[in-house]
Amino acid sequence: RNQVEFVISTEPTDGGIYRGHRGRMEIRVDMHGVSCHGSAPERGDNAIHKMAEVIQNVRDLNENPADDSVEIKGLVKMLDPKYNPEHWEDARFLGRGTCTTSQIFYTSPSRCAVADSCAISIDRRMTAGETYQSCLKEIEDLPACKKYAKDVKVSMYMYDRPAWTGHVYKTECFFPTWIN
């Protein structure tokens, strides 16, 4: 565990004292396709259709159980000592991690053409035992991402907006889990 000396949280807590918080990160998945005219979609490679499979996998990752009956084990697995031997108790205290598709973007030459790219944003909440590296790998290992490996890129968003002084300080969109 990290040794936290103090935390000031402006998030409403209903007067409660918190001794931990799930982490958060913002993940981006980009899918490449090939555009063509919508009257002959078989001539292209629809990035939106491929991304639809990724989106379903993200949903499964969030909702599935952790047992062997499913191809994608759900995030609830981190509450089990079998999958998270060092941190399962802290994970149970904080609650399981979650993920959801929060935005979708696409490019296409027109409304009557096959999309040549599609991207999604994933809001990922992390529990004890998860790192940003493990969360990125979890998305890269989804069946649809493996299926379209040559056309998919998984990355973490970066904050790069200028401060009031104009200085740009690039930083990852990642806030680690902490518990004390």
What kind of region is each of these model predictions?
Residues 12, 26-180:
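Metal-dependent amide/peptide-bond hydrolase catalytic core
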Residues 1-26, 91:
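Acidic/histidine-rich catalytic neighborhood of metal-dependent amide-processing enzymes
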